[in-house]
UniProtKB/Swiss-Prot annotation:
This is tRNA-2-methylthio-N(6)-dimethylallyladenosine synthase. Its EC number is 2.8.4.3. It comes from the Bacteria. Residues 19-134 form the MTTase N-terminal domain. The lineage of its organism: Bacteria, Bacillati, Actinomycetota, Actinomycetes, Micrococcales. Its main location: cytoplasm.
Amino acid sequence: MSTVAEHVRAAPSSVDRPRTYEVRTYGCQMNVHDSERLTGSLEAAGYVSAEGAEADIVVINTCAVRENADNKLYGNLGHLAGVKRRHEGMQIAVGGCLAQKDRATVLEKAPWVDVVFGTHNMGALPTLLERARHNGEAQLEILESLETFPSTLPTKRDEIASGWVSISVGCNNTCTFCIVPALRGKEKDRRPGDILAEIQALVDDGAVEVTLLGQNVNSYGVEFGDRQAFGKLLRAAGAIEGLERIRFTSPHPAAFTDDVIDAMAETPAVMPQLHMPLQSGSDRILKAMRRSYRSERFLGILDRVRTRVPDAAITTDIIVGFPGETEEDFQETLRVVEAARFSSAFTFQYSIRPGTPAATMEEQVPADVVKERYGRLTALQERISHEENQRVVGRTVEVLVSAHEGRKDGDTRRVTGRAQDGRLVHLDVPEGSAEPRPGDAVDVEVTRAAPFHLIADSVDGAPLRIRRTRAGDAWERAQADSCGVPTPATGASAGAAPRVSLGLPTLRVPTTASTSAPVGDGSAHPRHRA
């Protein structure tokens, strides 16, 4: 193991002050969710947020889906090397999918990194940091399989009103462009009772909205032999008192069945929103991607959803420039996008990911061709997004106010949140009106539309119609009591046989106890975007 003695001097003792941390997140909602668990684990071990100041510990939670993820990581690590030289006792940790994939390469390229951990052992981070600090030596720990389910780790949620709930981890699909199954393993499903208990715990903690997470949520139940388990789970979650909004991501078109559409339509708490990855509109390219569906099936799913859930906002993922993609293939993608009328799309230029079947395919598309096609696709989708948003102008929508969505709210006297269909809404607070708290719900009339958001300006200066919620109450309590930290749960006894723990999470528990709690063995912590 490489030494980091030349990069790390002894850190200040924790009796002087708690050490501070910052978690930087790249990638999907799974990673956002994982970062909440990393944050919770650090706070359970006595670390405190740097709150924008220069941190003693910087944790980078990485993504491996695109080539620029590597460039972004090593660019950030290069910058942090200079910071670390002047910041006594600073530590740097790299985790997530890219760490799982590259392993020792991270330390070879950036020997000033203190800890490298993977997707299967997030709960070990506090222990690895303490070990690296004590030994003056970098710690590399990558596990090949999941030991503790992520949802059982302590958590610190960014949004009190909303929470992520993992229903499964891993993926059984074999898409030729995707590295995720190799890094996160085969699908493992949680039991429905554990999921519902976690949702109830989140609601008890103030949440009014949850997003169910999985690499392929509608294959949920495959491990325990119930192919309609996901639809049943939606209905059961919808029966939890106090839970107002349910979302989920991401389904797979090949396994998306009508019982799920029925559950969406018949469960009031399930929001009129669907993220359905297309990837390509060309049947030939879909076959090369091993996507197991074709464009007409995909469009048929959207038609059935819109029949049962009118005005559903449907979003998607699209890859441009997959190996072998011709202009004719790309035109098929444009055709399907025009027909699908997505409210928005996450669009990507294909990049080679070593370790995937697509990386060795012939007919890699030249970068300049990919870039030109990408520009045409994004222009088309931006026009469609604007047109779809304009259809909402004049309607009254309920907005769940967010604490973090708006970036200019202080300058514009607006607050920001999400409508029930997931659209971002900036709403004006008229002079003299009460201001909604994060977590409160506000009924507003949409007055303007842009491609990526809606605006609700006051037309008559009347006070906002605010519905105060339990989530707003919880936010207010959190503002008054900012010393709460997650409490770690206990794991199996030493020497027990390895297994995957599928238990429940530990949520925020306000306490007046010292935040310099001893660091325990990471394997003893039960565990909880992507």
